[in-house]
């Protein structure tokens, strides 16, 4: 199906180039995380054959993977990093870098953990969602949830 649809073929070629660029930046990873993640992504992409809308499923899978690699390996310019101090505690900080990928991405860091988030529709402000983390910014303040079932942190952008 990918070879038969020009849009999907173009996304496949773009991902190939982005993946090559990421491998150049990931040369010192031990174990080689990028290669293992790519194999996992291919398995998930192949699950689109079970989808009722295969083309849309495949297109979304490619766009998300391209955006993930571009942000994670800093293949596109980022805006930031911006520091957010949470709950009035100087030691409780989240560092956010925004990437104008398609879809837009945010990499947030808190302590030793990192979350890769996607832009989500929001009635007001800017909202990103990761696996178990969320970041919702409005007028220089952010409501950040870090971890499954965790209470939200009330954060302000540091000057």
Predicted regions: what is each one?
Residues 1-159:
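N-terminal alpha-helical modules
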